[in-house]
Design a protein with these regions (language model features):
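Anionic-ligand binding region
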Residues: 136, 140-149, 167-199, 208
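Short beta-strand-to-turn element immediately C-terminal to the catalytic PLP-Schiff-base lysine
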Residues: 33, 130-132, 136-141, 253-257, ...
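Solvent-exposed alpha-helices and their adjacent loops that cap or buttress functional pockets
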Residues: 12-13, 21-24, 66-67, 120-121, ...
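Glycine-rich, charge-dense phosphate/pyrophosphate-binding loop(s)
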Residues: 200-293
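DPxDG-like acidic metal-binding loop motif
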Residues: 26, 86-110, 131-136
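Phosphate-handling active-site elements
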Residues: 35, 63-73, 100-116, 143-147, ...
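Alpha/beta catalytic cores of group-transfer enzymes, especially the acyltransferase/condensing modules
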Residues: 108-157, 243-245, 249
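ATP-binding N-lobe of GHMP and related small-molecule kinases
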Residues: 1-84, 98, 106-108, 284-286, ...
């Protein structure tokens, strides 16, 4: 039996639409073992079948290596909610691929994991930091493999994470984003992406806040999150330096380097928004891990 632990991820980091993402200290845990028939536990019954994304990713990885599919027993225990902008699908994809490698004896480095996960998921945004840990800037050159640039994130930073009780599906969130932008907007974004990566590395809150001024997606996606304005005001008035939408939402993530401020905000947010889950997270630096039981 093997156990695979995969971190949640926060994509975009405000300014880096479809480019930047970060692994965070919220996790999904998966166990796998060979079995006589496919069984999946720990998730709603509607997902306990061969269409489960974990098993689909498992089978796709086997096919990529020329291996036949075989039945397994999978148990899923997760703290990463679905359709909240925390990379829940990426945790499933990464776990399935890693399990396929482990149960067939394939030695696969992390670059290969990213490549296969990108093929399954369709883009490297979330799977790359889920595998590599840290913050990642990713892009896929024409007719080439995905390029993933990993950055360290200062361990001083705390991310106050507010998870509303409602979903925002990526497909819906993409519909509200303009398909074309002016050149001036592209220039605005590019400099700030560089500023964000540097600010995260150094823990420079002023730089992070200055860089976090997106003009591509947040002005439109915030309308899909009823609690956006109220949560934002509470966080900024309570001492957080800045706040962004995690992925396509509905999760919101505020940033500070002061643990007292983080704890104060967690209490205040839980009081004001009792239906939301509120966590104080850090950047996960290790990425997905496997344990042989």
């Amino acid at each position: 039996m093997i156990k695979i632990t995969v971190p949640a991820t926060s994509a975009n980091l405000g300014i880096g639409y479809d480019t930047l993402a970060m692994a965070v200290s919220l996790y999904s845990h998966f166990t796998f073992e060979r079995a006589d028939k496919l069984t999946i536990t720990g998730c709603p019954e509607e997902f306990q079948n061969e269409n489960n994304l974990v098993y689909v990713s498992f089978v796709d990885a086997l096919a990529a290596w020329g291996e036949p599919a075989f039945p397994v027993a999978i148990d899923i225990q997760t703290d990463v909610p679905v359709a909240r902008g925390l990379g829940s699908s990426s945790t499933c994809v990464v776990a399935g691929i890693m399990a396929a490698a482990a149960l067939t004896g394939h030695t696969v480095d992390r670059a290969e994991l990213v490549r296969i996960a990108t093929e399954v998921e369709g883009h490297p945004d979330n799977v790359a930091p889920a595998i590599l840990g840290g913050a990642v800037c990713s892009f896929t050159p024409t007719d080439s493999l995905p390029q993933c640039l990993r950055y360290e994130v200062s361990d001083r930073l705390r991310f106050i994470t507010v998870i509303p009780p409602y979903e925002v599906h990526t497909s819906e969130a993409r519909k509200v984003v303009p398909q074309e932008i002016p050149l001036s907007t592209a220039v605005w974004q590019m400099g700030r992406i560089a500023g964000m990566t540097r600010g995260l590395e150094t823990g420079d809150l002023d730089l992070i806040a200055a860089a976090n001024d997106d003009r591509i997606q947040e002005p439109y996606r915030r309308r899909l999150i009823p609690d956006y304005n109220a949560v934002r005001d509470t966080c900024l008035n309570g001492g957080a330096k800045t706040i962004w939408i995690s992925g396509s939402g509905s999760t919101l993530m505020a940033v500070t380097d002061d643990t007292i401020v983080a704890k104060f905000l967690q209490v205040k947010l839980r009081e004001q928004f009792p239906k939301c889950d509120t966590h104080i997270l850090t950047c996960d630096t290790e990425g997905a891990q496997i344990e042989y039981l």
